[in-house]
């Protein structure tokens, strides 16, 4: 819409975030390879035993098609591999009666889902959920900062190209050590030097 209105947008990266896979804390699996993740969500692997877990059917949980999580899952993780159909649930709609929507993650012993690290560790922290390592690399702040963890996205400030001086000052402040320390304090991974 900005382009249609003749507005040019400027994207300024200021933080890093990891796309993570979550399982029940009691699941004995601690790490999956990138290929195993693709195989699980494409339906090629259907039992946890195949990847070193218990002899249980894998219960996959997805996100709605128009969500940021689903977009990252399809573009960075699955690449061109088709995903199995998501689990659905029926909900009441004022306009359409009962409609089917993608079901929310349920943290059963055989579940696997995905989200962003910030959501899993800050917004919706749950001691019964475990974040999996990928290729043996845990989604720690250090592994996100140094780029070792394979699924990383940058967070951007989006402004008009011709921003006001107040907006310019705010953008510049977020890139200072003080601004980057705030980024870190709230649970994201800073891109630049912090005060800490």
For the regions a protein language model found, what residue spans apply to each?
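Exported/periplasmic ABC-transporter solute-binding proteins
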Residues: 1-196
């Amino acid at each position: 819409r900005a382009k249609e209105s003749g507005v040019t947008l400027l994207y300024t990266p200021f933080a890093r975030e990891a796309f993570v896979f979550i399982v029940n804390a009691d699941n004995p699996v601690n790490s999956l390879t990138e290929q195993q993740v693709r195989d699980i969500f494409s339906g090629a692997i259907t039992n946890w035993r195949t990847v070193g877990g218990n002899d249980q059917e894998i219960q996959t949980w997805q996100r709605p098609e128009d969500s940021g999580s689903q977009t990252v899952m399809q573009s960075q993780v699955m690449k061109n591999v088709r995903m199995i159909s998501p689990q659905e649930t029926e909900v009441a709609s004022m306009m359409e009666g009962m409609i089917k929507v993608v079901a929310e993650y349920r943290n059963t012993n055989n579940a696997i889902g995905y989200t962003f690290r910030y959501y899993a560790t800050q917004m919706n922290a749950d001691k019964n959920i475990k974040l999996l390592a990928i290729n043996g690399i845990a989604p720690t702040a250090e592994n996100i900062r140094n780029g070792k963890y394979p699924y990383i996205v940058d967070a951007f400030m989006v402004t008009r190209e011709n921003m006001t001086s107040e907006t310019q000052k705010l953008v510049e402040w977020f890139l200072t050590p003080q601004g980057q320390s705030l980024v870190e304090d709230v649970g994201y991974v800073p891109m630049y030097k912090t005060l800490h």
